[in-house]
Design a protein with these regions (language model features):
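A cross-family signal for N-terminal binding/gating loops and helix N-caps
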Residues: 1-348
């Protein structure tokens, strides 16, 4: 596999590896997606837009430079700016790989941070010295204006050029609540929707606040994904229920959609409309209630994204998939190529 180092790759050259429910592997162009689905299938995408969640500033008690990466909130409500979760880095920025970033100064509750025009207070440490609760000073309008003016998209060292905010907005980006892009939706473009409609494939959206994908700290990375707020519209819940009752497949576009759909179905087995917070992890021990398949990016083994795929297929199938992706030189990470993995995936 090859790191995709720009945003995003041209649709005409992007590839799609399809892993059937029997475990068969086939290579296609990503622009053939609609032709690879069945009439009646329902695609569900995350329409969250990404906010500029990286904030540089000063830790007042020590005078040290820090980078704050906002990573979560308990709600999608715009007026709630007092309960952020954030990952704290020491000096430097995205040019340095996260695993080589310096540690931040020792953090304590009530420490104050100066982040450009913003002021924030550390409310608590979240069982890790770099994971904190943050409370911003000011009302919601002031805080969001400050984030817009001072923040920049969270970015990793494998992309060498600075990313603009529009680089991390997918074609269906709407409500600005994500901390990193729900990048599986980069596989979509406007022509895709025309082809899906002509094929008789349904399309629906939900909003899920995608969090950070990596911190560079093994202990903290092992806790990813963190709790993430979501909202499922009534029309989407209805479309999913109808598809399930009629025996049609529900294909999630990305891991965040899987988390939201599965969490929203825990109580009754049917997806409920409304707001919630996805907790826990989807993985090899998860009995999926809703998602029959996932359209996802090319992820590397031993990541939280990869672990979620084990709910769809066993280790042996994913190992063959990884070998095929590696041999064919598929491009990885948020701006890379795609995989369509259908539940089952147990075959030779």
């Amino acid at each position: 596999m090859i790191v995709a180092a720009d945003a995003p790759i041209a649709h005409g050259t992007a590839r799609l590896l399809v892993v059937s429910d029997r475990g068969d592997l086939e290579h296609h162009g990503r622009d053939q997606l609609a032709d690879l689905l069945r009439p009646g299938d329902l695609l569900v995408a995350n329409d969250a837009a990404t906010i500029p969640a990286s904030l540089g500033g000063i830790h007042e008690r020590s005078g040290s430079e820090v980078e704050i990466r906002l990573a979560g909130r308990p709600t999608l409500r715009a007026d709630d700016v007092h309960r952020f979760v954030a990952v704290v880095f020491g000096t430097g920025d995205w040019h340095t790989a996260t695993e080589f970033r310096p540690q931040p100064p020792s953090l304590l509750p009530d420490d104050r941070l100066r982040l450009g025009p913003l002021r924030a207070t550390v409310t608590r440490l979240l069982d890790h010295p770099r994971l904190v609760g943050l409370d911003f000073e000011g009302d919601a309008a002031q805080v969001w204006a400050g984030i817009a003016a001072h923040g920049r998209p969270i970015q990793y060292a494998h992309v060498p050029r600075p990313l603009a905010l529009w680089d991390v907005w997918t074609p269906v980006a709407a409500r600005p609540v994500a901390f990193e892009p729900p990048s599986a939706a980069f596989a979509l473009r406007w022509a895709t929707f025309s082809r899906l409609r002509a094929r008789g494939v349904g399309f629906a959206t939900l909003t899920h606040a995608a969090g950070v994908s990596s911190t560079g700290d093994p202990a903290l990375d092992a806790r990813l994904p963190l709790d993430e707020a979501y909202c499922i519209p009534v029309r989407t819940a209805r479309a999913v229920r109808q598809a399930r009752r009629q025996g049609r497949r529900v294909i999630a576009i990305g891991t965040t959609v899987v988390r939201a759909l599965e969490h929203a179905s825990l109580a009754t087995g049917e997806v409920r409309a409304g707001a919630g917070t996805a907790t826990g992890r989807v993985g090899p021990g998860t009995a999926l209630r809703v998602a029959d398949g996932i359209l996802t990016g090319v992820h590397e083994p031993a990541t939280s994204h990869w672990e979620l795929l084990l709910a769809f297929a066993d280790d042996a199938t994913l190992a063959r998939m990884a070998g095929e992706l590696d041999q064919a030189g598929y491009r990885t990470h948020e701006f890379g190529e795609s995989v369509l993995l259908l539940r089952g995936g147990r075959g030779e």
